[in-house]
Amino acid sequence: MMTAANTHAIGSLDANGQKATLRKWLLFGLAVVTSCAWHVFPVSAEEPAKEPAKEPAKEAVVTDSTKKDCRYEGIGEKSNGGASGMELFPENDLFRPLWADPKQPQQFMSVHATQVRGPQRSHFNMWSVGFGDNFGLVGKRNGCNGWQVGILPAVFAQFDLDSGSTDLINADYVVGIPVSFRSGLFSGRVRLFHQSSHLGDEFILNNPGVTRVGLSYEVLEAILSLDAPGGWGRVYAGGATAIHVTPSDIDPNSVHWGFELRGPTMAAPLLAKPMPGTRLTPVFGSDFQAFEELNWTINTNVIGGLEWSKVGSDRRLRLLVSYYHGYSPYGQFFGTKLEMVGGGVYVSF
């Protein structure tokens, strides 16, 4: 039987139990709320700081840094940065070489069926080779406008293919100082050069009737050129005078003119796919010269063919056929009338 004291004790226990139970539920609820808050609102101080999201890597932008050969491309263009300072050993030239001129310093090998015109007509096959170029020493440019001074070494040699040992017939040696300039579509070249000519020893031995001439001269020449917009063609004209000639009785003056045409440039068939950037351009030109010593008779060279080049390169290779009619352009035979038909490989740097 329960006593009053027991009843009071049980009541006290119930009250205490209820308080303890309530306290447990409060602690449990606090733990749940704290746990939820921990996951929903994480404490930044205890969580490692996240790195800022990185932007996706951008692909490298390939810019067209292809340089332009001012002899053929970018004619008359100005630089966005304005005029540059003096430049040592400038690349290529501002004046396009007169590649239809038989005596243009360049690298070539050609074969010609040659007819000597005159009372005693004769025919032979000639191999003609040339080595030379315009090497820029110093210049100043604003894009493709400006001026340049260089040095000009060259040799031109002709061989008799019908002889048993391919005898050297004649060799012309040239060295000079060219000054070239360009302003828009106008360009020009002034040259002071020396040329000496020599017969081949085998040719003299096999032709005892031939007399060697000690031919040499120093010439001052000037040529002006006007390009068509876009560089598809040009005309040029000028003249020269010999300031010293051996033999001294040779008349000194000459005139020189011509034109060039360039067809549309296209991807080179068969080559553009395995070698990207290879281009093909049809080319044609005619060069005319007349000399006071030869009574101003017009000497004509007509030449044309195909030119291969590469984007961003100064190098060009041409396969050309040609027809020449007039006095010989080769020193020791300058008074001999020739007619030549042939073709060859021409390389430009």
List where the protein language model places each region.
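Solvent-exposed loop/turn segments connecting transmembrane beta-strands
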Residues: 120-126, 163-165, 244-253, 289-300, ...
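Transmembrane beta-barrel strands of outer-membrane/channel proteins
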Residues: 109-113, 151-155, 190-194, 237-241, ...
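Residues on the lipid-exposed face of transmembrane beta-strands in outer-membrane beta-barrel proteins
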Residues: 131-137, 177-183, 222-226, 257-263, ...
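Cleavable N-terminal export/targeting peptides
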Residues: 1-81
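Transmembrane beta-barrel domains of Gram-negative outer membranes and organellar outer membranes
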Residues: 55, 59-180
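Outer-membrane pore/translocation modules
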Residues: 69, 144-261, 325, 334-337
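Predominantly the C-terminal beta-signal and adjacent terminal strand-loop region
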Residues: 86-101, 295-349
